């Protein structure tokens, strides 16, 4: 049976039809399977805690190589929340370095900062996959991101043309994030938008997951 892959969620499940990647903060206990990172929202703590950056990076490094952790993130830049851009960019770059050192993909949080994300990608030339979660922008921006090797994960709200582009280029992921929707229902909705059978969508994303991390094969 081909499972449903939920690449980014804040809801843990024991459903055997679903393989979900639970997002955890750097200071939370890891579970299998999970992503661990320093969310841009948390960077605001650096404004009042001079040790926040060094401490959070150290804690993330300690967890990053664990078998339960299959990705680093959420990491990224948020122009509306968190610390100033200089602090956010420093913490983002440090997390990119960690992802590269442990050879694991990066889950990206991006709010009104696509140009900055692309700039970091071009400057650092990372070898590990980058997945931008919660993608809602248009096809033109999707084409720009995919052109720079950034994959896209779609929640409940998405641009259909961007979705189709991501599917056709094998850069598509699906997620529930903080939403209460069942990932199976989400797959059904997306398959309908793509005008394909849901089993075809499941198989495509599962094959991508198997290439992303062998951990998906061990579940």
Protein language model annotation of sequence segments:
Residues 1-219:
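Mid-domain alpha/beta scaffold segments of enzyme catalytic cores
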């Amino acid at each position: 049976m081909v499972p449903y892959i939920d690449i980014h969620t804040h809801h843990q499940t024991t459903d055997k039809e679903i393989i979900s990647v639970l997002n955890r903060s750097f200071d939370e206990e890891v579970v299998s399977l999970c992503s661990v990172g320093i969310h841009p929202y948390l960077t605001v703590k650096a404004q009042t805690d001079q040790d926040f950056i060094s401490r959070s990076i150290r804690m993330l490094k300690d967890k990053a190589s664990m078998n339960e952790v299959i990705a680093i993130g959420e990491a990224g830049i948020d122009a509306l929340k968190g610390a100033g851009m200089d602090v956010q960019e420093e913490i983002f770059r440090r997390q990119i370095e960690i992802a590269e050192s442990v050879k694991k993909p990066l889950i990206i949080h991006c709010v009104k900062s696509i140009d900055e994300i692309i700039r970091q990608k071009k400057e650092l030339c990372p070898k590990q996959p980058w997945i931008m979660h919660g993608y809602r922008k248009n096809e033109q921006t999707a084409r720009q991101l995919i052109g720079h090797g950034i994959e896209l994960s779609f929640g409940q709200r998405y641009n259909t043309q961007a979705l189709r582009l991501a599917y056709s280029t094998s850069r598509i992921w699906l997620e529930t994030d903080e939403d209460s929707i069942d990932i199976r229902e989400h797959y059904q909705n997306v398959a309908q938008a793509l005008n394909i059978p849901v089993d075809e969508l499941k198989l495509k994303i599962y094959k991508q997951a198997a290439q992303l991390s062998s951990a998906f094969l061990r579940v």
